């Protein structure tokens, strides 16, 4: 059983942050606040969400994008991190899995995800 003070703090953290509804297969743009010396800037990371795991304050998601020279780049973000400015859902993907780790082995058009029709 959790300490009631810790539980109250976690509930406040979750309530203070508005997170859009997204799943694995969705294309996201995450705006991350980066501190460099005494300056702060916002950097966008855009890619496909390949997994969500955990629950509550400790919940994380993995985003994969194809960078320069066709090199795959993956980043793991805590959903309720203070360094995340915003999460924007660009496309809803149509997939039948919760974890899309098989995309790591695919290249080119094979790595495309169909868009969810409304």
Swiss-Prot record:
Which keywords appear in this protein's UniProt record, sorted alphabetically?
Answer: Ribonucleoprotein, Ribosomal protein
User: What GO biological process terms are annotated to this protein in UniProt?
Assistant: translation
Check the record and name the Pfam families matching this protein.
Answer: Ribosomal_L19
Please name the PROSITE patterns in this protein's record. RIBOSOMAL_L19
The question of whether Ligase is a record keyword is answered with: no
The keyword Aminoacyl-tRNA synthetase belongs to this UniProt entry's keyword annotation: no
A GO cellular component term found in this entry reads: cytosolic large ribosomal subunit
Q: Which domain of life is it from?
A: Bacteria
* SUPFAM superfamilies documented for this protein: Translation proteins SH3-like domain
Q: Which Gene Ontology MF annotations are present?
A: structural constituent of ribosome
Tell me the PANTHER family matching this sequence: LARGE RIBOSOMAL SUBUNIT PROTEIN BL19M, RIBOSOMAL PROTEIN L19
According to its UniProt record, which protein family does this protein belong to?
Belongs to the bacterial ribosomal protein bL19 family.
HAMAP family in alphabetical order: Ribosomal_bL19
Q: What is known about what this protein does?
A: This protein is located at the 30S-50S ribosomal subunit interface and may play a role in the structure and function of the aminoacyl-tRNA binding site.
- This chain's protein is named Large ribosomal subunit protein bL19
